[in-house]
Amino acid sequence: MRILVLGIDGHLGWPLALRLAKRGHEVIGIDNLSTRRFSEEVGSDSAFPLPQPQERVSEAKKHLGVDITFYVGDITNYGFFKDIVQRYKPDAIVHFAEQRSAPYSMIDMDHAVYTVINNEVSTLRVIQAVLEVDPTIHILKMGTMGEYGTPAFDIPESIYVEAIVNGKKDKIIVPRKAGSVYHWTKVHDTDFLLHFQELYGLTVTDIMQGPVYGTRTEEIVEETLRTRFDFDEVWGTVVNRYCVEAILGLPLTVYGKGGQTRGFISLEDSIQALTLLLENPPKQGEYRVANQFAEIYSVKKIAEFVKKAGEELGLNVEIGSYENPRVEAEEHYYNPERKVLPSLGFYPKKRLPEDVKIMIKDLLPYKTRLERFKHVILPKTKWRKPQYVKRVR
C-alpha cells in the first residue's frame, strides 16, 4: 500500500513509518516539527536526541534498508497538503498531525485557541483532500480514550449506542465527557469525521487509544532510529514521567489520590495495532471505532511498578503525593470494551510491569542530559486558573 503519515516526526509517527516501510509499504510523511518547538517552549526536549528529518530518513535507509519520503510542512496549508495527496494518491492517510498535549492546551487561553484551530482545521483539511482527490482513501485518525472521560457505564467500541432518554429509545452517539481542551478537540474530530462520513460514504477508522509507554519497537535497532520521548509535566505521559523521575531521584509525581485509571499500551503494541488496522481496513463507507489499549491500571499502581523496577536497578525511588493540577475524578469506575483489535489477531507483546525496567535501562545512559530538564517535571500547569475563579459566598 501507499500510506501517507501525517505527524511522521512524532512519538508514534516515526516508529509507524519504520514498521510500514519495513513491511514493504510505500511511506510518505509530513510534519511541521511543531512538537520540537513546543517542547523547547516549555523548557524541555526529547530524552533521546533527535536527528533532523533528512538524517532520520538516511539512518532508516542505512540500518533498515527502507526508503521513506519526509516533507516538512503544515497540512493546514491546504495548497501544500492537497498537492502531496494529489501527487501520491495514497491508499490510506494516517492522521497524527495534531497538537497532542492536554496540559499544553490548558496553559492559558491562547494555547487553548491554538489547539482548537490547529486540530480542527487539520482534520477538516484531511477530509477535504480525500473528498477532492479520492473519496475511497482510508482515513485512520488517532483519537483518545480520553474522549469518553470516566463514565459509570462500560465504554462501548462503537460510534452509536442505544439509549433511553425521557422514556424514549433511540440510537445516539456514545456520550463524551472530555477533560481538557485537547481532549475536546478529539471529540470534535470524531464529530466532523462522522458527519462527512455519513454525507459522502468516507471510510474511517477512529482509534480511541490509551496512554502509550515504552522506548523500543522491533525497528529501533540503533540510537539514531529512536523516536522522541517526552517526560516533562506538559508533554510527558505518566509512565514516561515516572521513569525519568526515578532516574533523577525525584519523588514519583502521583497526582491526588492516584486512583485515576486508564487503558495503557506499549509503543511496540501500539505500532502493531496501527499496522493491523491499516492492513485490514474497514469496508468501504464504514466508520470503524477501535479502542486501542492492552492493560488497565491506576496511576498509583504504575508508580509501584516503577519503584520496584528502579530499586531492582539500584535506584532509590520514592512515591510522592502532589496536589492534582487537573480537574478529574481521582477514584472511579473504568471498563472499556475491546473487540476489534483481537478480531484482527492483535495480541500484546509487552506488559507494563516488566517494560518499565527496560525503559529505565534505556534512559539511564542519558541521565546527564535529563538533569538539564529537572526543573520542568513537577506539575505547574493547572486546569483551574485562580484569576477566573469567582468566590462564592
UniProtKB/Swiss-Prot annotation:
Annotated effect of mutating residue 145 to A: Loss of activity
Species name: Sulfolobus acidocaldarius (strain ATCC 33909 / DSM 639 / JCM 8929 / NBRC 15157 / NCIMB 11770)
Coiled-coil ranges from the UniProt annotation: none
Keyword terms: Hydrolase, NAD
Name of this protein: UDP-sulfoquinovose synthase
Superkingdom field: Archaea
PANTHER family on file: DTDP-D-GLUCOSE 4,6-DEHYDRATASE-RELATED (PTHR43000)
Consequence recorded when altering residue 182 to A: Loss of activity
Similarity section: Belongs to the NAD(P)-dependent epimerase/dehydratase family.
InterPro entries: Epimerase_deHydtase, NAD(P)-bd_dom_sf, UDP-sulfoquinovose_synthase
Enzyme Commission numbers on file: 3.13.1.1
Catalytic activity: sulfite + UDP-alpha-D-glucose + H(+) = UDP-alpha-D-6-sulfoquinovose + H2O
GN (gene name): agl3
Reported cofactor(s): NAD(+)
Catalytic residue list: 144, 182 (proton acceptor), 186
Effect upon mutating residue 95 to A: Loss of activity
Gene Ontology MF term list: UDPsulfoquinovose synthase activity
Gene null: resulting phenotype: Deletion of the gene results in a significant change in the size of the S-layer SlaA and the flagellin FlaB glycoproteins. Mutant has a significantly lower growth rate at elevated salt concentrations.
List of residues binding substrate: 100, 144, 182, 209, 238-241, 253-255, 326-328
Keyword Transmembrane helix: no
Pfam family, one: Epimerase
Function: Catalyzes the biosynthesis of UDP-sulfoquinovose by the transfer of sulfite to UDP-glucose. Important for the assembly of the S-layer N-glycans. The reaction probably occurs through an NAD(+)-dependent oxidation/dehydration/enolization/sulfite addition process. In vitro, in the absence of sulfite, UDP-D-glucose is converted via UDP-4-keto-D-glucose to UDP-D-glucose-5,6-ene.
Annotated positions binding NAD(+): 31-35, 74-75, 100, 118, 182, 186, 212
Keyword Transcription: no
